[in-house]
Amino acid sequence: MKKKINLIFFVIIFFLLQNKIVLSQIENSIIISVGDYPITRLDLLKEIKLIAILSNTEINQDNKEQIQGLAVKSLIKRNIKENEIKRRNISKYNKKQLETLISSTSKKIGLDRDGLKMILENNNLSYEELIKRFETDLKWNYMIFQIYKNKISLNAAEIEDKLQLRLENLESPNDKKINLIKEQIINSEKEKKLNMFSNMHFSNLERSIQINF
């Protein structure tokens, strides 16, 4: 009788281990390759959960495919960015902007930093991975600025027109207010130009890299 119980116990343990191995193989199966870099099913599942949490969205039958599509695009985009950053040896980024990103992300879902950490941990997600994700975007921004900063040209007439439009709605304008508004307009125009260069640079990379599903 004792031998029979031991045998049954052994069989149960064996099947549990087999199921665990099969599950691990499924999670680690490659579903997309971006150049030589793989993206696994587990990567996709984590990305889906992260998108749902950061957008404060509950996944259901109506939005499941849409969120999965966003997750796939996000993984591919980040992989391409990481590869380009690594290729160009980019390590610098704006530390203050990182703090701003963490703070704004937490506030967006009604939490502080500790609350954000907790909700990620409760969903088997890594806070450190989220920080790495932010760092990737900031390193990319730094890289784009360094590459294209000498190609940013602003139209003085357009800036002046936008300034006049803003001043029409301003009560009691003075030199300080006018200079501040003008600086805001110039910074906004520079940001638009950098975004344009960023999209162009990314599109060129995307076309040059083989992506297999």
Predicted regions and their residues:
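Bacterial N-terminal signal peptides
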Residues: 9-16
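Boundary at the C-terminal end of the N-terminal hydrophobic targeting segment
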Residues: 23-25
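Peptidyl-prolyl cis-trans isomerase
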Residues: 29, 38, 62-213
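N-terminal targeting signals for Sec/Tat export/insertion, comprising classic cleavable signal peptides
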Residues: 30-63
